[in-house]
Regions:
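A motif-centric signal for short, conserved binding hotspots located
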Residues: 1-254
């Protein structure tokens, strides 16, 4: 057997072209699986390899990071204690490992005392750190229980905060920050919307640069169409056409 040259190849044995992976969004034994906006036109929507090959938006696992830097990105990845590691995040050409997100919640490699690797975690989807989802509404677009935002190492979206400085950029309380970061503070902190409701973490297959830039791919379990049947984001016009948490966006600009 030819040995894997990259860590992700081991993960792809089950999570890429395998016919045995879950094929619907109701699969929730190990955490709720979002049903994304683009899935309706895809033949294999849960194929992580195809997500990460995206030319529209993806995390840099199988492809190197681009030269442009997300304004929320930290200089260095944080360990479980909140200390910077030696892993640089900014600049082109860097890679992430699957185990940067999917790992033991006490992994030694992240400063903990447990084993390294995705063997077990107290968090859904074998995540190393906390990541909350919105609860299912009665119908997509209607109001639903949502996780109140808490900051810090054990905060609501700690896995995002490992690389993105949430509280000093995206979720800063300052009015200017909510403008610069396009209402992330309003949505996440004030209105308790999960990151997952709007963003797909791996990458986006079948999307476009206008509708799916910045890993935007709405979870259709939570988000419904507007009163004209539209459900999409226009990044050129900075406008959302949808209904979410009982609020009609027809459109709402950001």
């Amino acid at each position: 057997m030819r040995p894997a040259a990259n860590q992700y190849e081991i993960c792809f044995k089950c999570h890429a072209n395998s016919n045995n992976k879950p094929q619907n969004a109701n699969y929730s034994v190990y955490g709720r699986t979002p049903y994304r906006y683009t899935y309706a036109v895809l033949s294999d929507p849960y194929n992580i390899r195809l997500d990460l090959q995206s030319s529209v938006a993806r995390h840099n696992v199988t492809q190197p990071s681009r030269g442009s830097v997300a304004p929320s990105l930290r200089l260095k990845m944080l360990d479980l204690s909140g200390n910077p590691t030696g892993r640089s995040l900014q600049g082109g050409g860097s890679y992430l490992y699957c185990t940067d997100c999917h790992n033991s919640d006490s992994a030694r490699g992240s400063g903990g005392i447990g084993p390294n690797g995705p063997h077990g975690s107290s968090y859904f989807h074998l995540l190393e750190r906390r990541y909350e989802y919105d609860a299912f509404p009665a119908t997509p677009g209607s109001n639903t229980a949502a996780p109140a935002y808490t900051p810090g190492l054990l905060g609501t979206y700690a896995i995002c905060d490992k690389c993105h400085d949430l509280d000093n950029s995206l979720l800063s309380q300052a009015t200017t920050a909510d403008v610069v970061f396009h209402k992330h503070y309003t949505h996440v902190v004030l209105q308790h919307t999960s990151c997952s409701t709007c963003h797909s973490a791996h990458g986006i297959q079948g999307g476009t640069s206008i509708n799916n830039a910045h890993l935007v791919n709405f979870d259709k379990n939570i988000v419904g169409p507007d009163n004209k049947g539209r459900l999409y984001l226009d990044t050129t016009a900075r406008a959302c056409y949808l209904t979410c948490h009982g609020v009609l966006h027809n459109p709402k600009t950001y």
